[in-house]
Amino acid sequence: MTLVHTCGNETGDESQNRISEKPVEIEGLVFSERADSQYADQFAIDRYDGGYSLIQVADGTGYLIVPENGKIPKGISKKIKIIKKPVGNIYLAATASMAMFDALGCGDRVKFSGTKIEDWYIPYAREAMENGDILYAGKYREPDYELLVSDGCKLSVQSTMIEHNPEVKEKLEELGITVFVDYSSYESHPLGRCEWIKVYGELTDNRELAEQLFQKQSEILDTIGEQPDTGKTVAFFYISSSGQAVTRKSGDYVNKMIGLAGGSNIFKDLDNGSGTSAIQMEMEKFYATAKDADIIIYNNNIGKDVKSLDDLISKNSFIADFKAVRNGDVWCTGQNLFQETMKIGEIISDFHLIFSGEYKDNPPKYLYRLEGGAEN
């Protein structure tokens, strides 16, 4: 199995990346080093003497991390935002980043959540909200400004969804809250997303731990890469409320995870010409190709209502005639699959266990098999 390091983002639009190839010159600061990046290309970390760091993200924005009691340099570009240490009282509206704060032992840096308690599948986040240690402060597009200001929030970590609501971003900044936009969803390689833990390690003074956690996932992938391709074809999808099959475009990171695990998407060159990864298909068209897939992986993170093979078949009678259904090779994602950004190597390993048949001796953690089919 060959591992390929790729550049660009999910949409294939590499022109979006405006990270400077050279260190940014900042008056009064002496450049020290640029942090290594193995898979990620949507951020860069430049370090300067005196404990200063500059995190650049794909849209060209820079975030200067100023050490505690450090002075803010003069004449800084308007494209550079200031984050003063110690970092805390964070309003976290980028759900995928919670796993990174948690893995670093810095979950307590997050004070406000843009995700409701019932939508968290990371134990720390759910428990912290139950205990009142993390407060719900509204979704990214409708934050509770009064709560954020009254409780001293100075930093908001957002996903790129905030770009669809620029007025919210502007309002937060007007209130003195720096808005950090996480571009990990634009990483073309699955481990590129995981590598963003280095960004959060930089913010929280946990560089070494961040590197160790990333390398652990990278080593898992290296081990899988030494195994031969399984030759198994896979259909990854869910059924929408309107009865359509919703799968992923061929360049999507989930399909890349499937490929890295030794499988292949049953759909070749599937693209909708837009920035979204979701592809909606009429069931008849979907059935024509997906019926021959060796393995079905049902994305239960969306509907959350498939507990058995009968539940799945009840969504559309065509499913009963799928090869994978007849052979008992039907699996579901756990509801925590897409929040566990620091387990990407392990999730790819789970895919490999399924594709290789090794799951019989080593059950996967993030997927479960639906009972039914010829084998059961």
Describe these PLM feature segments:
Residues 7-98, 209-236, 358-376:
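Bacterial Sec-exported substrate-binding components of ABC uptake systems
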Residues 53-59, 63-151, 155-161:
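A short, structured surface patch at a secondary-structure boundary
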Residues 88, 96-98, 113-124, 164-167, ...:
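Extracytoplasmic ligand-binding site segments that recognize negatively charged/polar headgroups
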